[in-house]
Amino acid sequence: MSHVDDGFRSLTLKRFPQTDDVNPLLAWEAADEYLLQQLDETEIRGPVLILNDTFGALSCALAEHSPYSIGDSYLSELGTRENLRHNGIAESSVTFLDSTADYPQAPGVVLIKVPKTLALLEQQLRALRKVVTAQTRIIAGAKARDIHTSTLELFEKVLGPTTTTLAWKKARLINCTFSHPQLPDAPQTLSWKLEDTGWTIHNHANVFSRTGLDIGARFFMQHLPENLDGEIVDLGCGNGVIGLSLLAKNPQAKVVFVDESPMAVDSSRLNVETNLPEAFERCEFMINNALSGVEPFRFNAVFCNPPFHQKHALTDNIAWEMFHHARRCLKINGELYIVANRHLDYFHKLKKIFGNCATIATNNKFVILKAVKQGRRR
């Protein structure tokens, strides 16, 4: 939990999911403060749009202006809602939209936390282009090291004249004025052929490894089991290539695709529809924080390529939560399969949670592990 005094109100903020007390990560950063400083004496007219507000620092500070919080992270939405409640602010003060929704017309102010991926930034800037005016104040912020020439060029190309500020507390801002530059349309997804399958994989802007199959997933696909039945889960599904492979290898099974990114879940749905339409009735698609709210003892198997970062921060908290959720939702003798970088040492984490862990395969970079739910051990 961390405290920020932003000139609008004094806030107490925490990350979601929370980090441990030994190595705490802040729920806000200098770029949030810097952005809010720019508005301290500015009269705000028209809708306020906030993009990629990681844990609600901006939304909480500007709640009296009824802002729209726009992003591609259900975890960020949950974190923002929790911080609103924690600071005594009505959740209804903020309207939440995902990045593929239509943005409100003629906003007075747009605040952007620059996302990790340039593709997501371009998608969001193109969406803003349809609604902003020359009078809209557009300000973006990030750590100075995360604002590159390519970032500034993208603002210039999509929206118009762009300048950057001096660094402050290692953060930097981007100021942009909309001038309606000429810009050709761009496809909503990036597509590529998946070798040895005949499948075409479609990827929305914020999908992990959207330009090609990542090497961890490729290794995982070589060792997926066959002849499973019942319900199985592609947890943290991304574009759904693991779930697609499971559908093809296990014609008696139903596959549940789960991710906290609406773009990932939409990509998975599109990839099943276009590549295995006959299997679509065996699928469920879920935007969720891991398996929160899912009934226990439901699944026969869970497959996971867990992230070890959240936005720009390195953390294993999300993976840890995924493992605990998987154990709760597996049937007795149900199996969790994961692929991970060898250096992360998930073997001992899984053994601590499940009481057992086995190595299925390994190479010089990745390891595939299996843990089995035995009895009712917590």
UniProtKB/Swiss-Prot annotation:
A cellular component annotation (GO) from this entry: cytoplasm
Disulfide bridge partners, by residue number: none
Keywords: Cytoplasm, Methyltransferase, rRNA processing, S-adenosyl-L-methionine, Transferase
The EC number(s) this enzyme carries: 2.1.1.174
GO MF annotation, one: nucleic acid binding
Cellular localization per UniProt: Cytoplasm
Enzyme class: transferase
Function field: Specifically methylates the guanine in position 1835 (m2G1835) of 23S rRNA.
Protein name stated in the entry: Ribosomal RNA large subunit methyltransferase G
Biological source species: Salmonella newport (strain SL254)
Gene name of the record: rlmG
